């Protein structure tokens, strides 16, 4: 036990490291001019920077999955090849369903994440803040490749409308059942669909201040 209400366990018990991802929610302008000058001119905000980084991970993920599918097919294991491809399709279906109200769909033949909207091709940098936020979260979970990960999120409800907030945890656990989620939130909508028992109030884990005298 570590403090009140918090317990740390690792599987296996002798694990030497923990894979983790950190997702930041605020879509504020990049303040580091040096970083901004080295990137695509369309990368203007912190969410844009996360998308830019994730695009690189997404390319690596696709190459890795393709190699494993080829190996499975060469070994005569077609069901395994189908299982490997199904997760990416599930991610694409999720995004298409979430963005359906604005008519955006993922271009499934593109190597990078791109969208079609009424015949016009869009980059992810042209999405709304809420759409960027949801894309960052779900793409992060996808490229974790079903591995055990610690997913840290600070107020992920920022910019997400209420329906998306209610679906968020279920979407994450569907894409990667091996992800452990730790998040801070002020939104009851995030935890109202069966997650109330997993909530820890900050007051339960605060360390009492002692008199320094």
Language-model segments: residues:
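Phosphate-coordinating catalytic segments in nucleotide- and nucleic-acid-processing enzymes
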Residues: 1-123
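Switch/communication elements of ASCE P-loop NTPase nucleotide-binding domains
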Residues: 93, 107-213
């Amino acid at each position: 036990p570590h403090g009140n209400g918090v317990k740390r366990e690792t599987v296996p018990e002798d694990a030497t490291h923990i894979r983790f991802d950190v997702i930041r929610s605020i879509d504020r302008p990049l303040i580091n001019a040096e970083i901004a000058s080295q990137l695509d001119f369309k990368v203007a905000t912190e969410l844009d920077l996360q998308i830019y980084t994730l695009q690189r991970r997404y390319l690596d993920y696709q190459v890795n999955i393709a190699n494993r599918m080829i190996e499975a097919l060469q070994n005569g294991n077609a069901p395994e090849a189908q299982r490997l491809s199904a997760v990416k399709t599930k991610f694409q279906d999720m995004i298409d369903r979430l963005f359906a109200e604005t008519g955006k769909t993922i271009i499934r033949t593109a190597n990078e994440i791109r969208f079609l909207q009424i015949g016009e091709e869009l980059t992810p940098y042209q999405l709304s803040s809420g759409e960027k936020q949801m894309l960052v979260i779900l793409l992060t979970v996808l490229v974790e490749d079903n591995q055990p990960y610690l997913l840290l999120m600070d107020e992920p409800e920022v910019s997400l409308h209420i329906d998306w907030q209610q679906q968020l945890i279920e979407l994450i656990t569907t894409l990667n059942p091996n992800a452990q989620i730790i998040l801070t939130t002020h939104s009851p909508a995030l935890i109202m669909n069966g997650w109330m028992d997993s909530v820890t109030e900050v007051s339960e884990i605060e360390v009492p201040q002692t008199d320094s005298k």
